[in-house]
């Protein structure tokens, strides 16, 4: 009864293992397990027991290579590093536009720092002057409105008096008209 036992290797071991030494070490481990009453777990069972998710092919290949004692291949990061910036016309134009924008922003910040307080004070004074002008216009409009209301009240009173006179005259005319009709009917 022979079990396939793989020995772990050190991850940074530079050379490959000798196959004779590997098989001798595997035999020693197997004999020791039998003597001590330990159980050997088959690799398939071990994978099922300790691996709840599937590893990628690249990672499985790296594990197999490490088990064989091969040196792990490092990731080639040189393809991800650009040593030179892109020199396309569009990128140069875009960087010039951004530089101009940053330059004008820097100038604006400098002007704001140097003259911002004065500009705010003068703007505040201008707002106060406008407030005073609005208050004066409000007072003038209120006076005009009051004058207009006085005139309207005066004309309404005058028209009211005329209307009262007209109603009295109309009542008298109506009364005389009725008296005339009654007199003509009686005669």
Curated annotation (Swiss-Prot):
Keyword annotations: mRNA processing, mRNA splicing, Nucleus, Spliceosome
One cellular component term from this protein's GO annotations in UniProt: spliceosomal complex
Segment forming the signal sequence: none
Main location: nucleus
Any GO BP: mRNA cis splicing, via spliceosome
Family affiliation: Belongs to the SPF27 family.
Record protein name field: Pre-mRNA-splicing factor cwf7
Lineage, uppermost ranks: Eukaryota, Fungi, Dikarya, Ascomycota, Taphrinomycotina
Gene name of this polypeptide: cwf7
